[in-house]
Amino acid sequence: KGSNDAWGSQFDADRIELLQRMADQIWEIDSTIYIVLEHFAENAEEIELADHGMLLWGNSQYNYAEASMGYHSNGKSDFSWGYYGSRGWGKPHLVSYFESHDEERLMYKNLSWGSSAGDYNIKDIHTAISRVKAVGAFFFTIPGPKMIWQFGELGYDNSIDDPCRLCEKPILWAYFEDYERIRLYKTFQALIQLRQQYPVFNSSNTEVDMDLGSSTGMKRIRLSLNNEQVVIIGNFNVVNQSMDPNFYHTGTWYDYFTGDSTFISDLNELINLDPGQFHIYSNFYIDPPEENLLSAQTESSFLPNTIEIKQNYPNPFNPSTFIQIASNGDKQTSLQIFDINGKLVDTLIDQNFISGINTYQWNAFSFPSGIYIARLSSGVTSKSIKMLLVK
């Protein structure tokens, strides 16, 4: 380690030949197997392994963490190396990540060492979570495979050294009952859906233009594939700033998270961004995700006039799923599960429900695959959602 293993990362033709031989033997048995290497050798060696069909981990933790914490001097928050094209790779075989079993959690770093200016403080839990949302917007939208670590989608903030680096880490299911963490989860979900549904976010043919190294913390990614263009801008500083979006063309552009449209007549007209704020603009309409995922408002701002039940997540699911309900008053409330034939199979709550937003887990271990109905009833009001259990 350190000074005595520098040879391990140097270009080694024999090692390349051995790994290629082993990969070929594996693929003779099953050609669909993914071979993923935690390798970290010279880039020239990794290119040969990637060209042969193997996937390689790409550690971008330091740079994403610096961006998240708000530190940008000397290009330290430039995470462009997390894109395979920036390394000169011809194939999208770089598995980039900002957290892993060996790297500290972004939320822990935000809460411990986050920057601040005036009333804006990244060490504040709400601000820290919003910073991870911004990281996600500049992570999932870059073409190429990605890796997220356990509970990173919920803002895992236990240190890697708690209780020790190699110890089992606490499994914090209670995060699913935290309103702010659920909004982070759904933000990641919405970003992943972009990758799944629109080739511009995942195709190896996408033209990627990145401006990520500014000491101001202002960052921009431009994506272009055929007639689809996307511009992502974000302010990773702790003060308000403006940025040139450098749109591809004049005309109508759409903001993904709000669904709002904007007519652009000046490609370089500056856009003002609050600290931690970002936008994903596309020249084609995309159905926006759930409202208010990026809002800094408190939970009470989103309470409905009566009761409300959100779509469960995940869905489809196996064997358990989470159901979020909201109420603006204290009323006798029941949350029941019915099968497709209308038979009551489970009751999650039947009690006086205190005003607020709460999340309940339904464990369907003993139930067969199929469509189930979750029905929320309070007084004369009843609302339902469909859920799909697939075993």
Predicted features and spans:
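Beta-strand-rich interaction surfaces with strong enrichment in secreted/lumenal proteins
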Residues: N268-I271, L348-N352
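C-terminal beta-strand-rich structural cap/linker in extracellular carbohydrate-active enzymes
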Residues: S265-L293
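A glycine-anchored, Pro-Gly-centered beta-turn/N-cap motif
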Residues: G251, G356, P368-I371
